[in-house]
From Swiss-Prot:
Subunit-structure text: Homodimer. Interacts with LigD.
Superkingdom field: Bacteria
Segments of this protein annotated with the region Disordered: 227-251
Species name: Allorhizobium ampelinum (strain ATCC BAA-846 / DSM 112012 / S4)
Residue stretches making up the Ku domain: 13-190
Keyword DNA repair attached: yes
Keywords annotated in UniProt: DNA damage, DNA recombination, DNA repair, DNA-binding, Plasmid
SMART domains found in the cross-reference section: Ku78
Keyword Lipid biosynthesis attributed: no
Basic residues bias spans: 228-240
Name assigned to this protein: Non-homologous end joining protein Ku
GO function terms (MF aspect): double-stranded DNA binding
């Protein structure tokens, strides 16, 4: 996969230390199967155009503008110049405001990851100093930056020779867990916990990206390949039901019985291995 072009260029600042940096998305959707909308009768691609909701006439790109709705069919028109006039300093600067212990941000607040790197040789040293200092103190930096005309809170995490920038969801965007977890039974059966722990230890592995491969993506690629060859897509054979599946026909299952069977199955496979 070829390196992507930087999504954002600007400056990383800490106190009096500043260096030019570039930020690139850490994830990609370009390898995903994408579809076009076609006219089923002709096979031709369908295209869309913006039209005026009242006159019905097409609207050219240069005629488009932003508008804030203040009432029904009543908008405040904003030009590009208007929007640029309210740009913040964070449009081109990531000024690290504070530091927090690494790992102290709950995952639910993390949104989109970016790779942050020095953008020229002159800034390499300053960038390395900031990154190494955060690594040594085992902290992450908290800052803000404007992305897509919106100021976003971000956290900067030293990683390898670079820094990973995570955009953060704002506090009011994350629903309190207490709204959902209140009333859940706190006490658990000790034997049940021990049984689950045994299963966990058996299935413990080191992380690998292959663990989260997309089976739908693979199936789509195979379907498309079959279509290209003008063959009917092969149907996956239905998996044979196992003895365990036959035994578990009821929707109501005794948790301890299920756990005992799971542990016995894990131990049996361990001995066989």
């Amino acid at each position: 996969m070829a390196p992507r072009r930087p999504y954002w260029r600007g400056y990383l600042k800490l106190s009096l230390v500043t260096c030019p940096v570039a930020m690139t998305p850490a994830t990609s959707e370009s390898e995903k199967v994408r579809f076009h909308t076609l006219n089923k009768d002709t096979g031709n691609r369908v295209v869309s155009h913006y039209v005026d909701s009242v006159t019905g006439k097409p609207v050219k790109d240069e005629q488009e503008a932003k508008g804030y709705e203040r009432g029904e069919n009543d908008y405040v028109l904003l030009t590009d110049e208007d929007l640029e006039s309210v740009e913040l300093e964070t449009v081109r600067t990531i000024d690290i405001e504070k530091f927090i212990p690494r790992g102290s941000i709950e995952w639910v607040y993390l949104e989109t990851p970016f790779y942050l790197t020095a953008n020229d040789k002159i800034g390499d040293e300053a960038f390395a100093v900031i990154r190494q200092a955060m690594e040594a103190e085992d902290v992450v930096g908290v800052s803000r930056v404007v992305l897509g005309r919106r100021e976003r809170a971000v956290v900067l995490e030293p990683r390898g020779e670079g820094i990973v920038v995570w955009t953060l969801r704002f506090g009011d965007e994350v629903r309190p867990e207490s709204e959902y977890f209140t009333g859940i039974e706190k006490k658990s059966d000790a034997k049940g916990v021990s049984a689950v722990e045994a299963v966990i230890k058996k299935r413990m592995q080191d992380w690998s990206p292959e663990m989260v491969s997309d089976p739908i993506q693979e199936s789509l690629l195979k379907l498309i390949a079959d279509k290209k060859k003008a063959k009917k897509p092969s149907k996956a054979k239905a998996s044979k039901s196992t003895k365990g599946d036959d035994e578990e026909k009821s929707n109501v299952v005794n948790i301890m019985d299920a756990l005992k069977k799971s542990v016995a199955k894990e131990l049996k496979s361990r001995k066989a291995g």
